[in-house]
């Protein structure tokens, strides 16, 4: 049976053309969401860039704590981290990669190598198809202020997970392994919905994507 890997990266250098990832985390699981392993790597070669990035360096205390407590491993380079992760994926027979906005993690970073010979699911597109069309999701976004300023609901992982747990004030940690955990919960909710979803397609490549972005209810 094919196993899955839900993965997240934290990067520096902007979303359009990032310099690379400084934190790589992921969870190995089956289609039922049963977890068999995880990884949590901090990349030494990228730390100087983190120190010069006002956004990224806010979480430096968390990374130092992870390293002190042994909950994360320091790896020298991105390339070495990809090599180690690939070996882990092969060990667990992972055939399907997932990420929230896979078009970023698997197209803008070295994680693209992890898709070689594997299928993928963009959890953003999956959530749009399985969760964000619900009237209750639109109502939640309207009442919690999770809007995009253009008459639409936010559909990022933080907003979708906040809806799933019924916590309008939930804030994503923005560290790779912790964010992978909430993305796995989104995957689980989508699978349990038994709704059709589109595999092997990044959200921004999906032809009907703009019709999927939910609008706020008129009676908000």
Ranges and model annotations:
Residues 164, 177-220:
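Acidic two-metal-ion nuclease catalytic site recognized across multiple nuclease folds
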Residues 51, 55-60, 64-65, 128-180:
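Active-site-proximal helix-loop-helix substrate-binding element of RNase H-like nuclease domains
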Residues 14-16, 128, 185:
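Conserved protein kinase catalytic core
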Residues 2-108, 112-113, 158:
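Conserved non-catalytic scaffold segment of RNase H-like nuclease domains
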Residues 9-12, 123, 183:
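Ser/Thr-centric signal marking residues that sit
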Residues 102-106, 126, 176:
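Short, solvent-exposed loop/turn segments at secondary-structure junctions
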Residues 116-132:
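Conserved beta-strand -> loop -> alpha-helix junction used to position metal-binding or nucleic-acid-contacting
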């Amino acid at each position: 049976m094919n196993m899955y890997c839900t993965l997240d990266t934290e990067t520096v250098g902007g979303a359009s053309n990032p310099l690379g990832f400084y934190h790589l985390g992921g969870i190995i699981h089956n289609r039922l969401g049963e977890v068999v392993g995880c990884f949590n790597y901090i990349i030494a070669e990228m730390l100087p860039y983190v120190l010069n990035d006002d956004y990224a360096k806010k979480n430096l205390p968390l990374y130092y704590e992870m390293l002190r407590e042994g909950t994360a491993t320091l790896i020298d380079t991105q390339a070495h981290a990809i090599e180690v992760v690939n070996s882990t994926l092969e060990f667990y027979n992972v055939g399907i990669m997932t990420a929230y906005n896979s078009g970023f993690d698997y197209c803008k970073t070295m994680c693209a190598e992890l898709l070689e010979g594997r299928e993928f699911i963009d959890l953003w597109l999956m959530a749009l198809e399985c969760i964000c069309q619900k009237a209750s999701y639109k109502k939640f976004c309207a009442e919690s202020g999770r809007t995009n300023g253009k008459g639409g609901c936010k559909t990022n992982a933080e907003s979708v997970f906040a809806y799933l747990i019924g916590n309008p004030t939930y804030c994503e940690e923005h560290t790779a392994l912790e964010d992978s955990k909430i993305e796995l919960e989104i995957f689980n909710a989508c699978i349990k919905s038994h709704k059709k979803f589109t595999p092997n397609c990044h959200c921004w490549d999906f032809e009907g994507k703009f019709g999927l972005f939910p609008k706020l209810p008129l009676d908000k």
